[in-house]
């Protein structure tokens, strides 16, 4: 699908306006009852023939934060964070194709690549939000979100980096070698190697390794991901997307250049004990955006597991509306 970005990202202005009007009408209906505004709702929408599940909460007239999850999890990753932000922000959190409750499309509908998944999420954001958005970028949500930011820099009100690197220095070198080895044409051997990463055992390890109190973590955090693993189509899509991770590396210089040129409002919240993505990734963001606030936590790859309150406080401090400004 070589023209997917043209079809989804470069939407005609009239189509974007129509989406905004439709969303405004729906939001007006949904927020007319004050008791509903701060309640998380669960919805599914069609984006280019792919059913995308998402969580939504808060008043759409407030600044919008789009939460982009990691691998191999889903928007469930943010279930503790959303209630802490809902008084100040409008929250939208999609499940990526083939993950969580979203549909796992066949390769004839959507290729399991970061370019194509990024195009779908870009179109989803255009469809379900109005005005500039703040992007929360975790793990594979980072390269997906940066594609959105690069395509539409004027739609970005801010960026939140959480264990997502824009530099090879941010990778554990051993893991980087794995990703680079999986690149190129798909082979049965590569696919077999990749499938070992889309497992509940690996997911549990990422939650626990480096956590302050690993035995006190909520086991629902990885049990929810086990649901997606149990569906063959989801596991196949995730495995092939994992093989595509190395394609993000050539984009690092342009992402750094974007940050240096645009200087967006930026917050970095980082689990310093992450065995995959190291604190050098946070330092690379700070070098590109010197005004970025950086917070390290004695925690794992999934820093929200133990630090949702502190991360919510940092988001509120950095991105709460200023007088006379929506974002």
Region spans (language model):
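Bacterial N-terminal signal peptides that target proteins for export
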Residues: 1-11
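Bacterial N-terminal signal peptides
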Residues: 9-19
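Flexible "cap/lid" subdomain of the alpha/beta-hydrolase fold that forms the substrate-access gate
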Residues: 27-40, 49-52, 57-60, 64, ...
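Structural cue for short, hydrophobic secondary-structure segments
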Residues: 67-70, 93
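Active-site glycine-rich loops that stabilize anionic/oxyanionic intermediates
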Residues: 70-73, 139
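Alpha/beta-hydrolase active-site loop signature
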Residues: 72, 97-100, 166, 300-303
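Serine-hydrolase catalytic-loop signature spanning alpha/beta hydrolases and amidase-signature enzymes
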Residues: 72-80, 91
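Catalytic histidine-centered segment of alpha/beta-hydrolase-like enzymes
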Residues: 299-312
